[in-house]
Amino acid sequence: MSEWPLNEARSWARERLSAAGIESVDADVRELLEWACDASSQWDLPTELTEEQAEKLRSGVGERALRIPLQHVTGRMFFRSLTLQSVPGVFIVRPETELLAGLAIDEAGAIVRERGEARVVDLCTGSGAIAFAVALEAASTEVWAVEKEADPFALACRNRDLVGACRVHLERADATALTTLTHQ
C-alpha cells in the first residue's frame, strides 16, 4: 500500500481502539493521526497517509490498544498552552494537574500584586509541567522545581528547554531533605 486515504485510516484506527475497549476513541484517534502525520491539528492532516505515516499510525494504535497511555505512545502531552515531552516512568499530567497549576498561578499573581514578586516551589516536579506553567504565566514569579529521580529530572530539563522556561531553577535533590528546603 503506497498511500492510505485519511478516512480509511481513521475508520481503521477507530475500529481497533473500540474493539480494545478504549473509552476516548475519537480523541485518541485524532491525536494518533496528528502524531503519525506530524500535524499540529486535525485541520493539517493530509488527505492520504504516506507509507511511513501509515506504519507509525499502525504502531501507535497497536500500543494504545494494549492500554499504553496515549501520552507515552506519542511521547508528548498537552498542558495548558504547553506541549511537553512524555516518557514512561514519569507521571502524565491530568486535568486535576491543570487545576492545581491554575491555583498556583492565581496565588502567585495575588502575591505579586501585594509584594511585587513571588516565589513558587514545585516539589517532586516530575515532567516540570506545573513549574513551567507558573513561570510562563505568572509574571515576576521566581520558580524552583525539585526532583530526586534521574529520569523525571532529565525529562524536566528537556521540557524546560522545549518550552523556553529558562527562569525555572531545576534542582536534582530530595524534596524532604532539610538542606534542599533551606537551599544550603
Each model region followed by its residue ranges:
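Non-catalytic accessory regions of SAM-dependent methyltransferases
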Residues: M1-L49
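Amphipathic alpha-helical regulatory segments at dimerization interfaces
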Residues: E15-A19, E63, N159-L162
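Short coil/turn residues that cap or connect secondary-structure elements
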Residues: L17-S24, A65, V112, T179
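Non-catalytic, surface-exposed connector residues within folded enzymatic/regulatory domains
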Residues: E23-A27, E51, V73, R94, ...
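Conserved AdoMet
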Residues: E31-E107
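Conserved SAM/SAH cofactor-binding pocket of Class I
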Residues: L99-Q184
